[in-house]
Structures are given as C-alpha cells and as structure tokens.
Curated annotation (Swiss-Prot):
InterPro entries: HAD-like_hydrolase_sf, HAD-like_sf, HAD-SF_hydro_IA, HAD_sf, PGP-like_dom2, Phosphonoacetald_hydro. Involved in phosphonate degradation. GO terms for molecular function: magnesium ion binding; phosphoglycolate phosphatase activity; phosphonoacetaldehyde hydrolase activity. This is Phosphonoacetaldehyde hydrolase. The gene is phnX. It comes from Bacillus cereus (strain ATCC 10987 / NRS 248).
C-alpha cells in the first residue's frame, strides 16, 4: 500500500507557527464587549470554520455565564454574527504577517514531491482569508497542489468533505492512500471521519500554543510535559500518529508503507 497524497492544514501546521493570527482577534472581540476570555479558551475550537469558532466560544459554559452577567442574557445569533464580522475585519488586516512557512515545511514538501506525492490542503479559514494567506505563502515558497476551504463544501471540520474534495481533485483513492496532517483536535476528527491516516504535529501547533521563542527558552522538562499533553489529546481524538516536527512525517509514511498497516 502506497501513500499517494498528503493533505495539510495551514495555520499552526504549515504556516503561522503557534497559530497566533486568529488568537488575539478572538480574544479582542469578546474583550471589547466586557467579556474576558483566556487564550486557552480561545484556542479550544481552533480549526473550525471561524464563525463556528465564535459560536463555539459563546457556548462554553463559563463564557456564556460571563456574557449573561454582563448583558443579562445569553449570546444571540445576532451577537455571533456581529462579532464574526468584526473578527473578519480585523483578521484581514493582519493575515499577511502570519503566512510565513514554518521552518522545514518547504523542504519536506519538496521531498514529498520528489517521491511523486501529491500535496493537498484544508483550512478553517474562509476562501477570502485564504486568498490572502495562500498568495503570501506562495511568494515565500509554499504552494500546495490544491486548496479547499469550508466555503467550497457543504460544511467544514469535523466533517470530511474538504478531504474528499481534495481526493477528487488530486485523483487519489481510496482514502487510506492519503495522510491528513494538522495541529488541532478538529484536524484529527476531520482526518478520521474521511477514513485517512491522521497525523498530529505538535511543535508550532495551536494545541501547544507556544511561539518559537517560548519553545526555545522553556525548561526542557516543562516543555516535554506540555508536548505529552498535546500528544495524548491528539491520540484521544483519533490521531494514528503524532510527530513533534514536520521532518518526522516521511518516517511515519515509510512506516505505514513498510508495515502494510491497515486503518482501524
């Protein structure tokens, strides 16, 4: 059994180390309304379509309770739409600064292509957002063969539709000849729901939530503890494999092929 394609996530996986572009904006749109949310809370739904992310935040019990304290009622769909529109407006202005490929990604992509592997991608960003990110990333040397956004399919993650559309456009089947790699719980669910080999990448991920500088300066024991927490979270949510850096991906691929593994 040969792996024929790899489907990559974007922010936190191939670009934007630590997935910081949307984080501050999510926190800001709530803070402006007198509702303080933590970075950990803001990251929890990461990987979803962004309006679904806003909605998921409003449904968290602590945030909903705080909103009720401030406004005397729970968030409405109108509130969600208003916050999402504000989120988009702010995010569009900063996205170009968060499109640089993560260290080592371009080299791994080049190596995969030398093997004849096709490169697809999925995202929680809208098509309009990705027009900005993909253009800037391409200028810096990263351009997958195909990109699918939630706008292109009936629903985003955790549904498998973006992966299926990649498979159709890349001409690869069955789905167990493909790997899905990402940095969030919703990525793991997307890959498993699509029937693909699913890999979670830890360093640079939204789930780890650390900048490169923080990783470099953190006590090794503390960093290892945080890495293992994320690793376990990925596995609990369906990851077949976890890797700390993208450079380990080809080893995983070779293991699948050599051992003739079967998705369970």
């Amino acid at each position: 059994m040969k792996i024929e394609a790899v489907i990559f996530d974007w922010a936190g996986t191939t670009v934007d180390y630590g997935c910081f572009a949307p984080l501050e904006v999510f926190m800001e749109i709530f803070h402006k309304r007198g509702v303080v949310i933590t970075a950990e809370e803001a990251r929890k739904p990461m990987g979803l379509l962004k309006i679904d992310h806003v909605r998921a935040l409003t449904e968290m019990p602590r945030i909903a309770s705080e909103w009720n304290r401030v406004f005397g009622q729970l968030p409405t769909e109108t509130d969600i739409q208003e916050m999402y529109e504000e989120f988009e407006e702010i995010l569009f202005t900063i996205l170009p600064r968060y499109a640089s490929p993560i260290h080592g990604v371009k080299e791994v992509i080049a190596s995969l292509r030398e093997r004849g592997i096709k490169i697809g991608s999925t995202t929680g960003y809208t098509r309009e957002m990705m027009d900005i990110v993909a253009k800037e990333a391409a200028l810096q040397g990263y351009k997958p063969d195909f990109l699918v956004t939630p706008d292109d399919v009936p629903a985003g993650r955790p549904y498998p539709w973006m992966c299926y559309k990649n498979a159709m456009e890349l001409g690869v089947y069955p789905m167990n000849h493909m790997i899905k790699i990402g940095d969030t719980v919703s990525d793991m669910k997307e890959g498993r729901n699509a029937g693909m080999w699913t890999v979670g990448v830890i360093l640079g991920s939204s789930e780890l939530g650390l900048s490169e500088e923080e990783v470099e300066n953190m006590d090794p024991v503390e960093l290892r503890e945080k890495i293992e927490v994320v690793r376990n979270r990925f596995v609990e949510n369906g990851a077949h494999f976890t890797i700390e850096t993208m450079q380990e991906l080809e080893t995983v691929m070779e293991h699948i092929e050599k051992q003739q593994l079967i998705i369970s």
